[in-house]
């Protein structure tokens, strides 16, 4: 399969490209409801990453932990906004899931991105999520 991006990624073409890539045996992908792909990152403890592809961008995201489990949440929110500069290619957000708010890590890339770039984004998001769950929380607690 070519590394070039198709004219427009679809769920099927994106799943097939991930599966047939050199990393395909380390990323389990499946379709979820709507236009979302669920990727289990095997090298990262089966961390779940969600992918959606639109006309102009591909969004990848993962839930971190419930906001109500974060001590001093207001101070932590300010802390992660300041720490944003040291988290490459990812942005923090808060997502509502079934009435509960979760910290979320998001990456975005052009819909014209080739599969190698998409795979890089998946790896970086997984690494950043693990770092956020441990190192950033520890740095905040120590601060």
Q: What spans do the regions from the language model cover?
A:
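Short N-terminal mixed-charge amphipathic segments
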Residues: 38-67
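Beta-strand-connecting loop/turn residues
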Residues: 34-35, 55-56, 99-101
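Short, internal acidic amphipathic alpha-helical interface segments
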Residues: 59-101
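Well-ordered alpha/beta subsegment
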Residues: 89-123, 127-143
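Long, highly charged amphipathic alpha-helices
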Residues: 13, 17, 75, 79, ...
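Charge-rich, low-complexity N-terminal segments
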Residues: 1-48, 86-89, 95
């Amino acid at each position: 399969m070519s590394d070039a991006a198709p004219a427009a990624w679809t769920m099927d073409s994106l799943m097939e490209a991930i599966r047939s890539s050199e990393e395909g045996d380390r990323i389990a992908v499946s379709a979820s409801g709507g236009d979302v792909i669920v990727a289990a990152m095997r090298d990262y403890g089966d961390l779940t990453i969600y992918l959606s592809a639109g006309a102009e961008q591909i969004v990848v995201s993962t839930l971190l932990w419930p906001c109500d489990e974060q001590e001093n949440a207001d101070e932590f929110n300010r802390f992660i906004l300041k720490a944003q500069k040291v988290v490459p290619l990812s942005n923090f957000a808060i997502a509502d899931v079934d009435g509960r708010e979760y910290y979320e890590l998001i990456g975005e890339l052009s819909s014209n991105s080739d599969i190698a770039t998409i795979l890089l984004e998946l790896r970086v998001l997984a690494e950043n999520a693990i770092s956020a769950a441990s190192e950033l929380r520890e740095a905040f607690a120590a601060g």
